[in-house]
Amino acid sequence: MVKFYDREFGSRLLIGSALYPSPAIMQDSIRESGAEIVTVSLRRETAGGKAGDQFWSLIRELGVTVLPNTAGCRGVRDAVTTAKLARELFATSWIKLEVIADNDTLQPDVVGLVEAAQILIKDGFEVFPYCTEDLSVALRLVDAGCRVIMPWAAPIGSARGITNRDALKLLRDRLPDITLVVDAGLGAPSHAAEAMELGYDAVLLNTAIAKAEDPVAMARGFKLAIEAGRTGFEAGLMGARDFASPSTPVIGTPFWHAVS
């Protein structure tokens, strides 16, 4: 089980709802992933109007928990306003907080992110901040009251996988009581498994599944990879070594093979 604030979930995969070839494939992919939390963009979809009604009907049919986000927001005021609208529309205090600094890299504006998180937490929100892998930023977010931190592995949609393994490991080591979710930049199931092997609590995916040749099959692949990576972490991975270490003992081997 993984805990997000005061709620527990069985799946360690959070999934996005954008970019799928069709609404039906979106639904099938989410079901196949086993995800219990689905992120939605308030800026991309509307809760009113025919198109918006159809989208929300599809989401409701899945019986999942909705995590609205502030994707596309370029400043603190914009992000805070969007978060408050999301709370009214979806009757949830959860918000995936994104404050973007640059349109080319979609890198988080970490200064604005911390400020927005402080404002929203004081207003009763439970914030899921999308941030870089910088420990100092994560510590400021924790000080602001965030109990979930969502560092990127690489820029959104880049499919590069974990580019700064040491920094992500440091976050895990220094924040043992915080729920950590790798968010953005993963492109293959092996990337997700690596994140879980580092001890991360969950992974958030969208583009890697939605843009696959077979999104439904890819959703299943990520589900299995996350389960495998978590199992490996819990089992206790052996440490890497600089030199070889024989797995077969020399006791009982023929004498002519023994080293004198």
Curated annotation (Swiss-Prot):
Organism: Rhodopseudomonas palustris (strain TIE-1)
InterPro entries: Aldolase_TIM, Thiazole_synthase_ThiG, ThiG
Family according to the record: Belongs to the ThiG family.
Catalytic activity of the protein: [ThiS sulfur-carrier protein]-C-terminal-Gly-aminoethanethioate + 2-iminoacetate + 1-deoxy-D-xylulose 5-phosphate = [ThiS sulfur-carrier protein]-C-terminal Gly-Gly + 2-[(2R,5Z)-2-carboxy-4-methylthiazol-5(2H)-ylidene]ethyl phosphate + 2 H2O + H(+)
Active site, per annotation: K96
One of the protein's GO biological processes: thiamine diphosphate biosynthetic process
GO CC annotation, single: cytoplasm
Subunit structure: Homotetramer. Forms heterodimers with either ThiH or ThiS.
Transmembrane regions: none
Keyword entries, A-Z: Cytoplasm, Schiff base, Thiamine biosynthesis, Transferase
Pathway linked to the protein: Cofactor biosynthesis; thiamine diphosphate biosynthesis
Enzyme Commission code(s) on record: 2.8.1.10
Keyword Cytoplasm applies: yes
Pfam families associated with the record: ThiG
Gene Ontology molecular function, alphabetical: thiazole synthase activity
Protein name as annotated: Thiazole synthase
Binding, 1-deoxy-D-xylulose 5-phosphate: G157, A184, G185, N206, T207
Location in the cell: Cytoplasm
